[in-house]
Amino acid sequence: MTKKVYVKTFGCQMNEYDSDKMVDVLNAAEGLEKTDTPEDADIILFNTCSVREKAQEKVFSDLGRVRELKEAKPDLLIGVGGCVASQEGASIVARAPYVDLVFGPQTLHRLPQMIDARRESGRAQVDITFPEIEKFDHLPPARVEGPSAFVSIMEGCSKYCSYCVVPYTRGDEVSRPLDDVLTEVAGLADQGVREVTLLGQNVNAYRGAIAAGSAEIADFATLIEYVADIPGIERIRYTTSHPKEFTQRLLDVYAKVPKLVDHLHLPVQHGSDRILMAMKRGYTVLEYKSVIRKLRAIRPNLSLSTDIIVGFPGETDADFDKTMALVHEMSYDTSFSFIYSPRPGTPAANLADDTPRELKLKRLQHLQATIEENVARISQSMLGKVERILVEGPSRKDPNELAGRTENNRVVNFPAPSAAHPRLIGQMIDVKINHAYPHSLRGELVLAHGDASAATH
């Protein structure tokens, strides 16, 4: 009987990528298959996030819920990975002694060895070291599930923003060699992947050796140019980028590489220079706006999303008003916005915070309502337009229909004959948008002359 692994993921897209790799590692080493039901699992893993306190506490809440599964099935293994694991280490086992494995983002490739050691010794295994890029040398080839895929190009962060735990939980920035990244992307393209998203905590800080041991370094712009030349790759995305690392070379790539999408996630975090300085972000609002102005001169249709923190210690009404002014000026399509959550061990955790939580919540609600208005307005502006989408698979709303994604990351659902589904999935096609909803669109297939038989038979 095939053994199964259940993985619950908290937090960022890097964690989503790491969770997929956990499954790949355990499948290659022990033949485990992924399950969406913890009750069916032989191994349960939590890939955790420590960016906000709520996510961190949710992990321990979930651990409490699976404890009874362990009591009913003593051979069940429970593991905690990700940033909470890096931060808490063995204290997780002290707090939840039924946990068998504790591993950091850089040691997930050691899971099979940790499992063997746990079974042989009967003791919980903890490995939260930072072996730099070793992880990627031990990961099996990715198993493709659709025409889009994520490729991690670097690990860690060296920015040390005053509020952020990532440098402490994932380590400093370490870039994969260029040839390793290109080999992975080419392998994905050979399996039918048409769109890749390049991942990193500060992805545009990429500085990878041309090959392992080489003294010659490729920057992020060079990497994008090489990825664009790989046969089969038709779209390139990346996340998350940092305003401080937006070089002229990267701006030039937007003019030279049409496969790089008209969508950018560029966290600003705040609209007040005073708060940005307290956050140690390393740029001013004017410098941030300058990057966007230059980009939109090259790509007038650029869609922009961001991250914003509300209620950072010392934030005044005037500071928040500056954030709102920036939101209106930038016309953000999406914002991941949250109330500031002090993280132990970070410099900002020691700052005095006398803003009432009710006021922070009111500010957050105002910000999110404004962003939602932007989302609706941008969606409405797409009505009647023909959009190029990558067909990803059956629609979640109606499996008899198909769904794809536009360059600005909108999901488009559209009807298509069932017989045509296998041919259309993984293809770049044109759809005309005829309905706009808050977070998705509906369209109809646009057929070029001579394409009708291919789509209807």
From Swiss-Prot:
MTTase N-terminal domain residues: 3-120
Alphabetic keyword roster: 4Fe-4S, Cytoplasm, Iron, Iron-sulfur, Metal-binding, S-adenosyl-L-methionine, Transferase, tRNA processing
Enzyme class: transferase
EC number(s) from the headed UniProt entry: 2.8.4.3
Entry superkingdom: Bacteria
Pfam family name, one: TRAM
Keyword Membrane found: no
Annotated [4Fe-4S] cluster 1 binding sites: C12, C49, C83
Residue span(s) of domain Radical SAM core: 143-377
Residues that hold [4Fe-4S] cluster 2 according to the record: C157, C161, C164
Domain TRAM: 380-447
Co-factor requirement: [4Fe-4S] cluster
Main location per the UniProt record: cytoplasm
Reaction equation(s) it catalyzes: N(6)-dimethylallyladenosine(37) in tRNA + (sulfur carrier)-SH + AH2 + 2 S-adenosyl-L-methionine = 2-methylsulfanyl-N(6)-dimethylallyladenosine(37) in tRNA + (sulfur carrier)-H + 5'-deoxyadenosine + L-methionine + A + S-adenosyl-L-homocysteine + 2 H(+)
Statement: the UniProt record of this protein carries the keyword Nucleotidyltransferase: no
Subcellular location(s) per record: Cytoplasm
Matches recorded under SUPFAM superfamilies: Radical SAM enzymes
A Gene Ontology term for the protein's cellular component: cytosol
GO molecular function, one term: 4 iron, 4 sulfur cluster binding
NCBIfam families reported for this sequence: miaB-methiolase (TIGR01574), MiaB/RimO family radical SAM methylthiotransferase (TIGR00089)
Assembly mode: Monomer.
Family that this chain belongs to: Belongs to the methylthiotransferase family. MiaB subfamily.
Name assigned to this protein: tRNA-2-methylthio-N(6)-dimethylallyladenosine synthase
Gene: miaB
